[in-house]
């Protein structure tokens, strides 16, 4: 708003205790500047994974909206989820879904005339050092998660502990980040659904209904499901022990569709962060404070 002091031919004023009148008038130029500023501050953030794409529109006050789209439905984004989405000024993302997914995503962004910036891993960024044998070959989603985890850890602890960063999707990646922000290495194991599907497809007598987690499973369905969860948890706890002799000091950050299922059965401290990759993408793109 623009404040005018004094008289105006069309102003409806009333006396004030200061001897002059204040009249609030909308400034077209100010309104235009506000609209432009809002546009410039909107960033569309993309995490294209193996099975689904997570995305979010980030504004100056945080996330405006968040969404998840199966990879098979990316081609309909502009007609559905993104149909009424405000135009972003910028799009940044990571893509491990392959070239075909990249082409489909870019086609959906064409309606806004926005070309996405695809990010990859590097030797160093945002306080994190990448010790992969060939740093650029580390999955971009894993790199973004490591950056986000380090930012969270340093924001809450003066002396941040070592941490294990887990993305539990189609595959489960388990990455070790030491107290100096150095990524030491990581594991890739089949995800829960992949383990269950593999048993069902390759073992003739194990086509059973979905099971539940039990401390001592007494039926085949529960034995299969509990075994898959325990396999993932065992790999995570082993990585904790490798990075610190006292695994109770190692924080675990979990993201991905199966994160809540796995997190329930891990020793604390555990933090499930739904949009860990998106946070890391924003940090790498220089959009987070």
Segments and roles (model prediction):
Residues 3, 18, 25-26, 30-125:
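N-terminal glycine/serine-rich phosphate-binding loop of ATP-dependent small-molecule kinases
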Residues 40, 126-163, 280-289:
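Conserved phosphate-binding catalytic cores of ATP/NTP-utilizing and phosphoryl-transfer enzymes
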Residues 40-63, 149, 159-183, 199, ...:
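Gly/Thr-rich phosphate-binding beta-strand-loop-beta motif of the actin/hexokinase/Hsp70
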Residues 67, 213-251, 258-261, 269-270:
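Adenine-nucleotide phosphate-binding core of ATP-dependent small-molecule kinases
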Residues 77-90, 153, 239-250:
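Phosphate/pyrophosphate-binding loops at sites that engage ATP/ADP/AMP, CoA/4′-phosphopantetheine
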Residues 92-98, 168-170, 250-259:
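Glycine-rich beta-strand-to-loop/alpha-helix junction loops that act as flexible
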Residues 114-126, 267-282:
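Conserved phosphate-binding/catalytic loops in two-lobed NTP-binding clefts
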Residues 145-157, 184-225, 230, 284-288:
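Glycine-rich phosphate-binding loop plus the immediately following alpha-helix
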């Amino acid at each position: 708003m623009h404040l005018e002091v004094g008289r105006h031919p069309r102003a409806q004023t009333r006396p004030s205790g200061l001897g002059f009148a204040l009249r609030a008038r909308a400034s077209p130029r100010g309104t235009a500047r506000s609209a432009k500023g809002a546009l410039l501050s909107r960033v569309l953030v993309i995490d294209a994974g193996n099975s689904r794409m997570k995305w979010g529109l980030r504004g100056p006050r945080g996330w405006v909206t968040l969404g998840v789209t199966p990879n098979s439905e990316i081609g309909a984004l502009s007609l559905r989820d993104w149909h009424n989405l405000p135009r972003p000024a910028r799009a940044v993302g990571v893509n491990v879904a392959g070239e075909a997914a990249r082409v489909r995503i870019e086609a959906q962004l064409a309606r806004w005339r926005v070309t996405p910036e695809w990010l990859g891993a590097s030797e160093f960024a945002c306080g994190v050092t990448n010790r992969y044998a060939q740093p650029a070959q580390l999955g971009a989603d894993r790199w973004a998660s490591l950056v986000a985890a380090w930012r969270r850890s340093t924001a809450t602890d003066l002396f941040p502990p070592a941490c294990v960063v887990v993305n539990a999707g189609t595959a489960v990646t388990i990455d070790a980040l030491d107290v100096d922000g150095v990524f030491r290495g990581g594991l890739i194991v089949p995800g829960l659904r992949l383990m269950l599907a593999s048993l069902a497809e390759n073992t003739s007598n194990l086509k059973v209904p979905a099971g539940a987690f039990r401390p001592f499973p007494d039926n085949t369905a529960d034995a299969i499901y509990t075994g898959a969860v325990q396999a993932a948890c065992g790999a995570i706890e082993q990585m904790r022990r490798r990075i610190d002799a006292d695994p109770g000091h190692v924080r675990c950050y979990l993201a991905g569709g199966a994160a809540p299922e796995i997190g329930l059965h891990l020793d604390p401290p555990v933090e499930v962060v739904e949009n860990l990759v998106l946070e890391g993408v924003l940090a790498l793109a220089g959009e987070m404070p």
